[in-house]
């Protein structure tokens, strides 16, 4: 029997070593298990947690990798909610764009080709615009309302359009030079931002108010009164007249003198006459209205074109990107002619813009509805190839869209819509309009086929509804861009049209083409839905329909 000072069981040195080894083995095994949990299971749990944030992304793995980068750089944590991640992602995107600007400027300073310098100038302008749009979107997201969601979606759609436009302009550059601008990365980030936005907020489901006799609600009551007035009676802030009876002799001078970032409407009245100039309403010139003496009396004319060295973007006779832009009772034309190819008369990238009772004349690429929300009413647009193109969210009502006689071997395309991502809130809607032939086309209409449109980009979206289609429209209705490009991903629709060109029995059989029979589907392309008209155009006496005719 052991004494009180001795253990009941004595252990040898060898036994103690075995026990220590087992404990060490257990600790190592536990550490390895924890390692596997952290480095194998945790990423899986992270992916599960944030998969909803990236569920609408075209490349969900890329989207998740961007989120992972934010966490790795301690910009957000793995517990951050989707809204916080989106805002930080947008802040970092601004940083990326600001880094790209000096790179583009440096490339521009290293080349001598005028056309390429022009393209890079366009890119610099578009990058500056995009920085502002992303910053505005961050502020809108913070407000967490449905109307602000619609604003952010429109602005971020514009950012993606800006980047794609820049890339299109650089098509003649070497791949190495394009890679240096980081444009592919910016485009990817813009697409992911739209996908994140779609997952963290609820789209605006606007309530429609029946009736006619109103302008979309984003026109204020003061703007309504202005739009009811003639130019000479409007009480303009500035008057332009060629004969010296106004303060300015050119529209460009008057626009330059207008206040920057005005919170109230600033009106420029342009007296009758023909003004040969190119005019740009920059992003700083907000809430600007330009009004003339009528679409046949006040004419702004230019002739810049691609053949002579301009970029398509910069060829516009009048370009407007300042928010809240209104153009009324005026003609904008580009007289370059069909032999000069792309030659824009009017380019609009101004959010919540209104073009009312205007004439827009050119041939190829007449009206560049570039981006943001736009409304056209009682206007007259002429052209040949792709004469309404771009990636705005735009509605035309009570307009005449007039196909002209094109050049030899050419065909007329009324639209060429440029949506590049399904999360973009963009598309072209033609409602209560007449699509007809010009006097010079009528005698030879059978020699030059005219189509409602063709897909400029992969997710092109255009709807023609409740409109008159003249006999100039080819029975197939729509044309290919190149082979089967975009035929499965586009959305082209027709709803309740009339006229000799409105029959759909011989229309194209593409997967993306729709003869719309459900009014609820057509409603998505109305003023209230496509451009959220109920939230930014107040009631006016100018005829307007927010939904469909009964």
UniProtKB/Swiss-Prot annotation:
GO terms for biological process: cell wall modification; fruit ripening; pectin catabolic process. Its main location: secreted. The keyword ATP-binding does not apply. SUPFAM superfamilies: Pectin lyase-like, Plant invertase/pectin methylesterase inhibitor. It is found in: Secreted, Cell wall. Its EC number is 3.1.1.11. Pectinesterase may play a role in cell wall metabolism during fruit growth and development prior to ripening and may be required for preparing cell walls for softening by polygalacturonase during fruit ripening. The PMEI region may act as an autoinhibitory domain and prevent untimely PME activity during transport. This is Pectinesterase 2.1. The lineage of its organism: Eukaryota, Viridiplantae, Streptophyta, Embryophyta, Tracheophyta. The gene is PME2.1.
């Amino acid at each position: 029997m052991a004494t009180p000072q001795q253990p009941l069981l004595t252990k040898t040195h060898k036994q103690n070593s075995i026990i220590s080894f087992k404990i060490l083995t257990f600790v190592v095994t536990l550490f390895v298990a924890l390692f596997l949990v952290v480095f194998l299971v945790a990423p899986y749990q992270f992916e599960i947690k944030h998969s909803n944030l990236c569920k609408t992304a075209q490349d969900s793995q890329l989207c998740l990798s961007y989120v992972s980068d934010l966490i790795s750089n301690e910009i957000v944590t793995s517990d951050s909610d989707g809204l916080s991640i989106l805002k930080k992602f947008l802040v970092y995107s601004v940083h990326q764009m600001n880094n790209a600007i000096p790179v583009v400027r440096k490339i521009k300073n290293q080349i001598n080709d005028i056309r390429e310098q022009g393209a890079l100038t366009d890119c610099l302008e578009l990058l500056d615009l995009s920085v502002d749009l992303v910053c505005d979107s961050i502020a809108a997201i913070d407000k967490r309302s449905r109307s602000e969601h619609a604003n952010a979606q429109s602005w971020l759609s514009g950012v993606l359009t800006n980047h794609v436009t820049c890339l299109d302009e650089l098509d003649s550059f070497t791949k190495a030079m394009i890679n240096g601008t980081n444009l592919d990365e910016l485009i990817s980030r813009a697409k992911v931002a739209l996908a994140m936005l779609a997952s963290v907020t609820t789209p605006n489901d606007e309530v429609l108010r029946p009736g006619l006799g109103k302008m979309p609600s984003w026109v204020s009551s003061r703007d309504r009164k202005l739009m009811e007035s003639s130019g000479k009676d409007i009480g303009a802030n500035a008057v332009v007249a060629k004969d010296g009876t106004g303060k300015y002799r050119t529209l460009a001078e008057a626009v330059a003198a207008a206040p920057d970032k005005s919170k109230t409407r600033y009106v420029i009245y342009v007296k009758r006459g023909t003004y040969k100039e190119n005019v740009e309403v920059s992003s700083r010139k907000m809430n600007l209205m330009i009004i003339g003496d009528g679409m046949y009396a006040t004419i702004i004319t230019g002739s810049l074109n691609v053949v002579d060295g301009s970029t398509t973007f910069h060829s516009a006779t009048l370009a407007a990107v300042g928010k809240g832009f209104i153009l009324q009772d005026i003609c904008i034309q580009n007289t370059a002619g069909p032999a000069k190819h792309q030659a824009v008369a009017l380019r609009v990238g101004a959010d919540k813009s209104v073009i009312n009772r205007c004439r827009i004349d050119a041939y190829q690429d007449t009206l560049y509805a570039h981006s943001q929300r736009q409304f056209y009413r009682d206007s007259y647009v002429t052209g040949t190839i792709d004469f309404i193109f771009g990636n705005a969210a735009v509605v035309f009502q009570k307009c005449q869209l007039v196909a002209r006689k094109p050049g030899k071997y050419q065909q007329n395309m009324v639209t060429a819509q440029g949506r590049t991502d399904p999360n973009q809130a963009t598309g072209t809607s033609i409602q209560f309009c007449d699509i007809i032939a010009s006097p010079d086309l009528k005698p030879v209409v059978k020699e030059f086929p005219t189509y409602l449109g063709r897909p400029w980009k992969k997710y092109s979206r255009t709807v023609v509804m409740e409109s008159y289609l003249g006999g100039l429209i080819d029975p197939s209705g729509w044309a290919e861009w190149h082979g089967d490009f975009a035929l499965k991903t586009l959305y082209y629709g027709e709803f309740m049209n009339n006229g000799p060109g409105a029959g759909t029995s011989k229309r194209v059989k593409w997967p993306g083409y729709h003869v719309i029979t459900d009014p609820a589907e057509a409603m998505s392309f109305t003023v209230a839905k496509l451009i959220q008209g109920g939230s930014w155009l107040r009631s006016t006496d100018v005829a307007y329909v927010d939904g469909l005719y009964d």
